[in-house]
């Protein structure tokens, strides 16, 4: 089918796609059109990576936005929503869709700040957002949601994910219930039960294994590649590793390689080794460009991880994992797409939709550690096939190859049976679990989706879980447990079968925190206000909501919790991923707990209780935040806690979000600790001590420049407004444009830097950096 023959598209759209080189539709795309995707039909497209799923979504969205019957135009009020699983994908997709601005359409993107209603998005024709953001928009009453004409769910097979799957599942169920005549288009990898997904969404199904270029899969063993069609190709290993040999073989054919490993450490170690291979394949021009990229990488953060990544990139290799800063990952992805970086060693996060195809994919590690199982477990077929799907770049590669590595003949046969010849597993709903249901049940009640228990069960009947089971007993049982929990903690009230969210429950839903997180925070704030560190039953956990009326707060309750106490409080919530305790940490942090016991909020478990280790893990996480807020260098924090810059920033962002929730909840409880919580939040947000809060909040200043300015005598925003320009220029290390922007922000009467000399005393090499004072005491400096 030619794109010009697609029905339902306004004039000029077909010409646009033809100008982009799309004249003939791929078979799955043509089948989607035949099944009515441009005429309002719901559709599930279960097709391999790089087989044109995005174009199916674009055709659906553009036709849904348009109005006018046989001669459609973009003059209607419809809005298309594109849901992505990752923040990184949101920006990438929004950039793709900006090509449609030529038709007068506007594109918006939203991924953060879950408490806002997204009113600014109302004027957009296409909105790109994560499922969590869409869920929060519904909770906060975003009016434009009612104007949706089409919603696209990318990577919908991720409903199978324990953590994020329930949110995507419930969000789609909410949208279908809230918005009349909403078209739903779900894009999925090839899965074992695409028909069930289609039945859930009342959708047409396109289920295809077609790819635009050939994908050859196989296993390397000994000195040969064994392919799925029974053929073999010689690939000698020699004295090196299998991975290095496969990468070298790919380079000899001017191809690039993605290597998937099972841990961050393995990704970094693999990249270091592969740099010796890729470095020999670089031209002088490539070396120059890679040197510039390496310099950019070093500028992202002052950490060993940043330096190691830069060293690898300079030689044409890289690693990619969640411990990297966002800027690191973007630089690596762009350099790989530009064919400057020849090999990337990555954890499976890179297979989750980010557009980084390669000539050859190597799945080096097909097992990873599973803490629940207590050992190494094989990866799912679906996950490995997602990695396979990254092989082959349409328009750039004549074919793609995906290779597993075997160390024995038995393993060779096992890998063929387990992955090469196997079909992917069916996706299964993960909704019927109490942690998944807590937040969604509260939100359904708080937003008025349901006002009775029967109504709640009817709403949940629109989920994938309900489609996949004939036995609703488990879901009803777990839902009953959740309702009792929400009632006991004061988030909902039950009057017979009637359900109503309390004011606190309404707030918790809008804040988008797990109700258990909110209960933990509330208990801690109430405990602080009572100045109590023990419960009646020593060592037992009892929520404040269970203590009875005699434990009510005094009318003038006032408390000043410390930053460490607040950081520990939010680190104990299920919304925070705690740091693991390493060997020797238990004794060390037990000592810290005794030293700071008066600061720590809420009940403390006894040392012999199972909960004690999690409690200590939260204390370790809190100490990281306290070090950050005390201006300790990022490099020292990374070394002390064995984390990457991305981990630090992730913990900081989560802490800021949870402390904002704590501040709002303190106001709801009339506990007058709002200023203390706000200060702790601001300090962790900017990574500074109290005296720098005013300066660090100025755009383009940040923690290090704020400390330099303060040490040079510029101690406040008012001081900065009238500061000596040479001092400001020195504090930003001679960057005139940056100095001008800072002075313009604060309203300096003459921000220009022409002829201004930098005051070198304002930029000392040591002692003036954030955390640069090596004599500075820190919470982490204990024996």
Curated annotation (Swiss-Prot):
Pfam families in the record, alphabetically? DEAD, Helicase_C, Helicase_dom4_arc
- What sequence ranges are listed for the domain Helicase ATP-binding? 34-209
Q: Where is this region: Disordered?
A: 744-783
Residue span, Helicase C-terminal domain: 242-443
Q: Which SUPFAM superfamilies match?
A: P-loop containing nucleoside triphosphate hydrolases, Sec63 N-terminal domain-like, Winged helix' DNA-binding domain
Sorted UniProt keywords: ATP-binding, DNA damage, DNA repair, DNA-binding, Helicase, Hydrolase, Isomerase, Nucleotide-binding
Q: Where are the membrane-spanning stretches?
A: none
Q: Which GO molecular function annotations are given, in alphabetical order?
A: 3'-5' DNA helicase activity; ATP binding; ATP hydrolysis activity; DNA binding
**Coiled coil regions in record:** none
Family stated for the protein in its record: Belongs to the helicase family. Hel308 subfamily.
Protein's name in the database: ATP-dependent DNA helicase Hel308
* Species assigned in the record: Halobacterium salinarum (strain ATCC 700922 / JCM 11081 / NRC-1) (Halobacterium halobium)
Gene name as annotated: hel308
